[in-house]
Amino acid sequence: MAPYSVVASVLAAAPPQQSGSVRQLPSTINRAITQRSQSRHVASASSASSPTTMLEERDNLWEIGGPYWWPFSSFTPPAHLDGSLPGDRGFDPFSLGTSWGQPPVDVSDPNYDESRLRWLLEGELYNGRLAMLAVVGVLTVEAQGKGPWWEIPGNLNLFGTPYVVAVVGGHLAFALLEKKRLENFRETGEAGHFGAARFDPLDLTEANPLGTDYNRQAEVRNCRLAMLTFLGFSVQAWVTGKGPIENAKDHLASPFEANIFTYGDRGTNVVAIFSAFAAVMHIAELAREKKAEDKPRSRNRTLSGSS
């Protein structure tokens, strides 16, 4: 899929189009954002020294809706998500932001927890960018009639080089690039790409009149959409044995005869697995919120008992 990487890079770098000026959020949402910002700790780093992946203006959201992914306004986001990261909707039901991941910085660093969140964001962006490239490659391969996308890699012959040799060479090249990314993160707080901690060779960030925050939010949205899309492609391949374009044609031709429930146990199992995961995720969020509410109460009881 290497010949399509240039096209994919352009698509990945371009922010989604939006007609007219950016709409202001409703007053109720503005109030929710104000309350959210006041209830969270203030970031210590200035915008000049912060990584370019951080928002210049906290809670600078373009999505219509509140700053919290949970549909009930009475719930509050986790304390470690302070709105300074792009795409921050308070989504961390399993509290991974406080325990998951080991950033390449000293554990004794006073900003270690902030580095962890930035490191997790780098992981999301990196996987999302790969997913955007993969989605374009999957669709292009099938649109050209070259067969299912999962069968293509083993049949490729890149410039007369056997596929295995190309894979080994690619891994060695990426190992060097990953080493540079780690060094960049230690020095600047972001990893970047191809040796640059701020990878923007076409200056698309500065060229967008909507501002850098819009670009950062747009990239995170596109990354998440691409990761979900590629997951859908993979599930389709396992359930139906067909590519996304062929599946779409079959479903549009006969919606009631070609859908996830008409492919036997595999389709039913997929629905059951995703439904169970969604239920566990919401239960975990309820438990996290309940725990957050109990902490102040316990502290108040302790203070009243000692006085």
UniProtKB/Swiss-Prot annotation:
This is Chlorophyll a-b binding protein 1, chloroplastic. Residues 34-54 are annotated as: Disordered. Component of a light-harvesting complex (LHC). The LHC functions as a light receptor, it captures and delivers excitation energy to photosystems with which it is closely associated. Functions in a far-red LHC by absorbing far-red light and promoting photosystem II (PSII) excitation, likely with entropy-driven uphill excitation energy transfer. Exhibits a typical absorption band at 671 nm (Qy band), as well as a large far-red absorption band at 706.5 together with fluorescence emission at around 713 nm (F713). Chlorophyll a 9 binds at Q236, N247, A258, I260. All-trans-violaxanthin binds at D200, L202, F233, P244. It is a multi-pass membrane protein. Its main location: plastid. Chlorophyll a 5 binds at I64, N127, E178, R181. GO terms for molecular function: chlorophyll binding. InterPro entries: Chloro_AB-bd_pln (IPR001344), Chloroa_b-bind (IPR022796). Chlorophyll a 11 binds at Y163, H171. The lineage of its organism: Eukaryota, Viridiplantae, Chlorophyta, core chlorophytes, Trebouxiophyceae. Belongs to the light-harvesting chlorophyll a/b-binding (LHC) protein family. Chlorophyll a 3 binds at L120.
